[in-house]
């Protein structure tokens, strides 16, 4: 099923339900993008978001200098945000609020390294004009006109891609006389939670999960981990129950 996490990041915020895509949904979403002539240009940013768990501003602010493909790491040291300052809406660079936000994370999925390597190779040809912001340059992710990508841009893309995928999947399922495997409604924040879910399913090293996710508070990581493992236990119990007979 789709996991829900009843914890918002950061203390003092109301509890919210946050879904994580299942492994099947994740695969279907990325495969659809990679095969789509209309949406394939969205593949690099979606793969990096889903494969690193970066916050959206950490990802859209990534520069060529933040990526070390020899050591398979990404340095997270600034955010790209879009907000109104002095009555003018524009992009700004901010630095992480807490020490845990500044971190070097391992690249865990080979697909992330592949997408980043390909992007770095073509970026000079793709973007002849370098964007410079607060001394940062060599930004990896740009919109169609070569400017910065916003969370709003990515959310609109997710929505359009999901609608297109679901329409195609419903037609295909009808042809094959089966139940369609549809994507739920989700946004860019669910991509981070999806990564965190896969990480929690793969390791019980809470400190490692906290460092990769950049959670300031250990209890945030612990709450998410506990919730995800409980959900998994429920699913496993249902499967096993069907096979157990005492008498």
Describe the residue ranges of each PLM region.
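Basic, Lys/Arg- and aromatic-enriched nucleic-acid-binding interface segment
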Residues: 1-56, 60-62, 70, 100-102, ...
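Short, basic (Lys/Arg/His-rich) helix/loop patches that form interaction surfaces
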Residues: 31-42, 52, 105, 124-131, ...
């Amino acid at each position: 099923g789709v996991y829900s996490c009843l914890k918002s990041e950061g203390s003092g915020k109301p509890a919210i339900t946050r879904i994580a895509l299942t492994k099947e949904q994740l695969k279907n979403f990325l495969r659809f993008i990679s095969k789509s002539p209309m949406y394939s240009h969205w593949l690099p940013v979606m793969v990096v978001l889903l494969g690193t768990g970066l916050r959206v501003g950490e990802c859209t602010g990534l520069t060529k200098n933040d990526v070390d493909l020899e050591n398979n790491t990404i340095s997270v040291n600034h955010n790209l945000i879009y907000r109104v300052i002095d009555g003018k809406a524009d992009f700004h660079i901010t630095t992480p609020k807490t020490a845990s936000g500044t971190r070097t994370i391992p690249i865990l999925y080979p697909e992330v390294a592949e997408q980043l390597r390909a992007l770095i190779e073509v970026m000079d040809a793709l973007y002849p004009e370098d964007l410079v912001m607060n001394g940062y340059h060599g930004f990896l992710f740009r919109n169609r006109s070569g400017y910065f990508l916003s969370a709003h841009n990515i959310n609109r893309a997710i929505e359009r891609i999901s609608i297109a995928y679901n329409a195609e999947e419903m037609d295909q399922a009808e042809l094959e006389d089966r139940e369609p495997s549809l994507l739920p409604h989700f946004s860019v924040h669910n991509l981070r939670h999806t990564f965190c879910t896969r990480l929690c399913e793969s390791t019980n090293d809470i400190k490692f999960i906290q460092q990769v996710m950049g959670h300031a508070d250990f209890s945030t990581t612990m709450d998410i981990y506990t919730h995800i493992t409980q959900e998994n236990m429920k699913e496993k119990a249902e499967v096993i129950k069907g096979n157990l007979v005492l008498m």
